[in-house]
From Swiss-Prot:
It comes from Pyrus communis. It catalyses: a (2R,3S,4S)-leucoanthocyanidin + NADP(+) = a (2R,3R)-dihydroflavonol + NADPH + H(+); (2S)-flavan-4-ol + NADP(+) = (2S)-flavanone + NADPH + H(+). This is Bifunctional dihydroflavonol 4-reductase/flavanone 4-reductase. InterPro entries: Epimerase_deHydtase, NAD(P)-bd_dom_sf, NAD(P)_dehydrat-like. The gene is DFR. The lineage of its organism: Eukaryota, Viridiplantae, Streptophyta, Embryophyta, Tracheophyta. Changing residue 347 to G: In strain: cv. Conference and cv. Pyrodwarf.
Length: 347
């Protein structure tokens, strides 16, 4: 358990990963300083303020990656920082200035704030699988030594390219700065994060993960040879590595691999009411899975709790409960008949 007097800061706290991490940190006994862009926007922060222990152990702080020095105050006095915030605008018209530069400068600004505070014991950065395997030819297995090909991303400009570039360049710049300035810095590299969630809107990773249900064809390529982790496993790994005295370097956090064909087979069996496609234009019927190795994370003692089915059922249930994906009419009628109106969003 965290000490009740131990304060930690979570950036991007209202988002998909950030809000679940805040919930788990509060449960573990930490006092949490949550940074958000606008603490007065009730629609964006209500799910944080409604959390158990929020009244006594949670404070909201205004900070923005584009505003240099805006995290200093929230980080001052904290013993740990979880930097989760990242610009996620795949439709940006000016990706260099709206996504890439703010991501790099924002992470360096967090590192500088940790230095200035003089109280921060460890900084945990949520990186991305997009820093590892985005390259022309996929390897069968990836580990923490691999880095994405930034020039390949810039030339091909696939869906999400600016996110992959921004996270890769930011993490590389941060490692250089952390080593030069002797900062205890670790990065966690999640693959596609799936599961139930607290935020009121559709998380970007579920737009991708649930793309066969949502018919988001431009995202099929991302999950062609997919790797997945449950949101709860990811957040628990953050706390585990923060507390572990020997944690160092990069850690891939991924529990399952599945090709798009394996994924839709499971989704079609689970949700026959959605007309989920079985053929995907430009995607071979015979795909080999691509594996992201979490060997390093497992070897330090972390154990994953959730199955691939757990992730997707949790995600679909949460989306339905929040009205983000339609429930087909026949399913609604069946639910009403059996009084199944209480949809669990997970814990």
């Amino acid at each position: 358990m965290g000490s009740e007097s131990e304060s930690v800061c979570v950036t991007g706290a209202s988002g998909f990963i950030g809000s679940w991490l805040v919930m788990r940190l509060l449960e573990h006994g930490y006092t949490v300083r949550a940074t958000v862009r606008d603490p007065t926007n009730q629609k964006k922060v209500k799910h944080l303020l409604d959390l158990p222990k929020a009244e006594t152990h949670l404070t909201l702080w205004k900070a923005d990656l584009a505003d240099e020095g805006s995290f200093d105050e929230a980080i001052q006095g904290c013993s740990g920082v979880f930097h989760v915030a990242t610009p996620m605008d795949f439709e940006s018209r000016d990706p260099e200035n709206e996504v890439i530069k703010p991501t790099i400068n924002g992470l360096l600004d967090i590192l500088k704030a940790c230095q200035k505070a003089k109280t921060v014991r460890k900084l945990v950065f949520t990186s991305s699988a997009g820093t590892v395997n985005v390259e022309e030819h996929q390897k069968p297995v990836y580990d923490e030594s691999n880095w994405s090909d930034v020039e390949f991303c810039r030339s091909v400009k696939m869906t999400g390219w600016m996110y992959f570039v921004s996270k890769t360049l930011a993490e590389q710049a941060a490692w250089k700065y952390a080593k030069e300035n002797n900062i205890d810095f670790i990065t966690i590299i999640p693959t596609l994060v799936i599961g139930p969630f607290l935020m009121p809107s559709m998380p970007p990773s579920l737009i991708t993960g649930l793309s066969p249900i949502l018919r988001n064809e431009s995202h099929y390529g991302i999950i062609k040879q997919g790797q997945y982790v449950h949101l709860d496993d990811l957040c628990l790994s953050h706390i585990y590595l923060y507390k572990h005295p020997k944690a160092e370097g990069r850690y891939i956090c991924s529990s399952h691999d599945a090709t798009i064909h394996e994924l839709v087979k499971m989704l079609r069996e689970k949700y026959p009411e959605y007309n989920i496609p079985t053929k995907f234009k430009g995607i071979d019927d015979n795909l080999e899975p691509v594996h992201f190795s979490s060997k390093k994370l497992r070897e330090i003692g972390f154990e994953f709790k959730y199955s691939l089915e757990d992730m997707f059922v949790g995600a679909v249930d949460a989306c339905r409960a929040k009205g983000l994906i339609p429930i087909p009419a026949e399913k609604t009628e069946a639910a009403e008949e059996s009084n199944l109106v209480d949809v669990k969003v997970g814990s």
